[in-house]
Amino acid sequence: MIIKKIEEILQMQTFGMYYKACYQWAKLFEYIDMAWIYCPESGRCGELDMVADFYLPDQDAYFIVDLGRAGRGYTNCKELSGKLKRLIVLGGPDGGFRVFENGEDYSKVESVLCQCASCGRYFFMNEPGSYECRVCGKYDGDHH
């Protein structure tokens, strides 16, 4: 009986941390004027929409908060990004994030949030990749 109660408390704490992390990421998206849709309540029914926490429509990318969410098991972001040809960002509760794209897993150092010099909008990308803005399409040169 006591073990079950402890498990319930732990589950509430885990999901509480998940919702707090989602809230913090949503606040960041709002602050930098990044368009976002909260997937669990969006009514969208694609494979990524079922596991992702946010869809970033201007970039056609998905964002997954790296904490447990009720009803969601483990998500293999590397495999999913390759299969569906989408950029997936895995964001932690500490503000760190990693980018997965075309089946590649980029380290936190290689995963960046850029601001386009032309349109001023922010977008996620991998550092070895192209610096073409994922919002307006403007190319800002080779920064490698």
Where would I find each of the regions flagged by the language model?
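Acidic-basic catalytic patches of nuclease active cores, encompassing PD-(D/E)XK
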Residues: 1-40
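Short beta-strand-loop-alpha-helix junction that forms the active-site gateway
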Residues: 5-16, 55-76
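Active-site beta-strand-loop-beta-strand hairpin of nuclease catalytic cores
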Residues: 31, 48-63, 78-83
